């Protein structure tokens, strides 16, 4: 085997030679075995261990080289997260300026929007409540048709006919029904107008039941005389 030929045994030191061997000479030499069966295996195993150590160190260097960019990326991401999670007082001057400018813009836009809203509201309701009520009254006064719907009034007439007729129910023509409806509307409008005069006399605007009751009492007293 080639290992047997390459391996050399260390010579025995003589009694006359008192010089100590060098470290380099003893590092690659195995001690003298007792039975003489060592074929330089220690030398070969030491070489193998050295090679293994070199391989491990090389792989560690490569792993370290690969881990460095990953560590940098993680550190940069961590710094970004820290910047995002920081309290607003610890921000940079540039970010402070940006936030101040944005706040000033929103504050300036707030009063303008409020003014626009108020203007729109004023333009939408320029007429007061009293004027709107007077306009509605004039519109109803100039209305040519009947104010009470025809179908509800006909039901009311039928109810009174059934209630006060003893024998067979009466029949009403369309013209008679229209005349009754117009006369009823005239009576109601005149009575409400008289009642509203009492409301104005009491310096009020809303018509109440007591005003209509007082006007009915006055009308009844006038009929007796």
From Swiss-Prot:
GO cellular component terms attached to this protein's record: CENP-A containing nucleosome; chromosome, centromeric region; condensed chromosome, centromeric region; inner kinetochore; kinetochore; nucleosome; nucleus
GO biological process: chromosome segregation; heterochromatin formation; kinetochore assembly; kinetochore organization; mitotic cell cycle; mitotic metaphase chromosome alignment; spindle assembly
Cellular compartments annotated: Nucleus; Chromosome, Centromere, Kinetochore
Region of interest (Disordered), ranges: 1-131
Pfam family, one: Histone
Keywords, in A-Z order: Centromere, Chromosome, DNA-binding, Kinetochore, Nucleosome core, Nucleus, Phosphoprotein
Polar residues composition-biased segments: 43-52, 86-103
Gene3D superfamilies referenced in this protein's UniProt entry, alphabetically: Histone, subunit A
Main location per the UniProt record: nucleus
Annotated region (H3-like), positions in chain: 133-225
Residue list for modification Phosphothreonine: 76
Domain of life: Eukaryota
Molecular-function GO term, any one: structural constituent of chromatin
InterPro entries (alphabetical): Histone-fold, Histone_H2A/H2B/H3, Histone_H3/CENP-A
List of residues that carry Phosphoserine: 74-75, 77
Keyword DNA-binding among record annotations: yes
Keyword Nucleus among record annotations: yes
Biased composition (Basic residues): 1-11
Assembly and oligomerization: Forms a nucleosome-like histone octamer containing two molecules each of H2A, H2B, cid and H4 assembled in one cid-H4 heterotetramer and two H2A-H2B heterodimers. The cid-H4 heterotetramer is more compact and structurally more rigid than corresponding H3-H4 heterotetramers. Interacts with the condensin subunit Cap-G. Interacts with Chrac-14.
Family the UniProt entry places it in: Belongs to the histone H3 family.
Primary role: Histone H3-like variant which exclusively replaces conventional H3 in the nucleosome core of centromeric chromatin at the inner plate of the kinetochore. Required for recruitment and assembly of kinetochore proteins, mitotic progression and chromosome segregation. May serve as an epigenetic mark that propagates centromere identity through replication and cell division.
Protein name in the entry: Histone H3-like centromeric protein cid
Gene giving rise to this polypeptide: cid
